[in-house]
Amino acid sequence: MPIIERILAREILDSRGNPTIQVEVTTDYGTTGVANVPSGASTGSREALELRDKGTKYENNWFGGKGVMTAVDNVNEIIALELEGLSVFNQREIDKIMIDLDGTATKSKLGANAILGVSLAVAKAAAAELEMPLYRYIGGANAHVLPLPMLNVLNGGEHASNTVDFQEFMIMPVGSKSLRQALQMANKVFHNLAKLLKKAGYGTQVGDEGGFAPNCKSHEEVLDYLVEAIKIAGYTPATKGKNAIAIALDAACSELYDEKTKKYTFKKLKQAISEKRPGFEHLGDVKLEYTSDELIEYFGKLIDKYPIISIEDGLAESDWEGFAKMTAKYGHKVQIVGDDLTVTNPKLLEKAIEQKSMNAILIKLNQIGTLSETMDAINKAQKANMACVVSHRSGETEDTTIADLAVAFNTGQIKTGSMSRTDRIAKYNRLLVIEEELGEQSEFEGIKAFYNIK
């Protein structure tokens, strides 16, 4: 039985140039598993805590105290001593030991980034010991479904320095018959979108997740460009049918919400109008503030006008009542995804199931901090007939764990960025390899991934 012989953490850089943590786990057989931990920009307040160096002896190492040497030390000096000598196959025992060792609800003592790095590296070392891919080790013989990708082709919100308030505008090739075809379709739309934006006088610089970041004057303008790009690429902007490509949104409305006024404000657009930027002078009468009910109605108008199939974080993380209203109103035709609402937490997911707050959950490993708890959240959601969307973070690395996780649990959907930036493309490349490995055993469900819409 291979045991953990050494655990070593180090500081590396993520896709934004910020420090993050990498962990190596080596067994007594000489096998090593390596994991890099991602980092989010738009984060839910109930997420497990990412430990940074501000206020510590390492504070001045990196800009803004964003180093992770405190978390690195916690791995090398505390966690390693507890886990070395244990079987590398005892994933749940190892995760529980780390959870108990930390002793806080948000993993704030040792850091969720420290704990997650070890948790994932252990799983990778175990898979390597058995000479099998990670998706097979985690998911067993039943791991065979390739996920339909949500491709974030236009960025806004916290992910881009532009005038667009909603954070992500994504395309989903629901009419595709394979993962490869889905990526081919998305590729054509992405490059046609670039041409459209250039023609309109917008730059084609990209945001954190590889999507374009133009200074559009409304969400509708963005959606119009997406629809046009889909058509020019030779596909149909629709939520179903042959060659159909649908649209998905991540509104990230917690970032727009004011707890005092109980209103949502399109802050970036408001600023552009108040500063009278070129092209925004005539927008003085545009509605910029919404109550929860008004925002739900606004989404309804978008759903009626555009081929929208999924809306993530359409309301703030504290607006449980609003989420339930939105799901009751639109859940029969649109996927209502909870991200900040549930933060991959099985306990919060239970509340969402009871209150019928959503019909899909976003799965982010670093929101909860261990592989075991992530697996519990996925299992609980699937039993409740909720769809699971495995997701990246805005701060990523070349690590491709989430690609394997999506296949391991047959989630049917993955959200991992646009058709640019190596940190995003790495996940798609990993999925293409998995598709090839599985061959005829693989299944790609396309529109069937939305079994939760009814």
UniProtKB/Swiss-Prot annotation:
It is found in: Cytoplasm; Secreted; Cell surface. (2R)-2-phosphoglycerate binds at Q167, K364, R393, S394, K415. InterPro entries: Enolase (IPR000941), Enolase-like_C_sf (IPR036849), Enolase-like_N (IPR029017), Enolase_C (IPR020810), Enolase_CS (IPR020809), Enolase_N (IPR020811). Pfam families: Enolase_C, Enolase_N. Mg(2+) binds at D250, E312, D339. GO terms for biological process: glycolytic process. Keywords: Cytoplasm, Glycolysis, Lyase, Magnesium, Metal-binding, Secreted. It is an enzyme of class 4 (lyase). Binds a second Mg(2+) ion via substrate during catalysis. The keyword Cell inner membrane does not apply. The active site is at E209, K364. Belongs to the enolase family. This is Enolase.
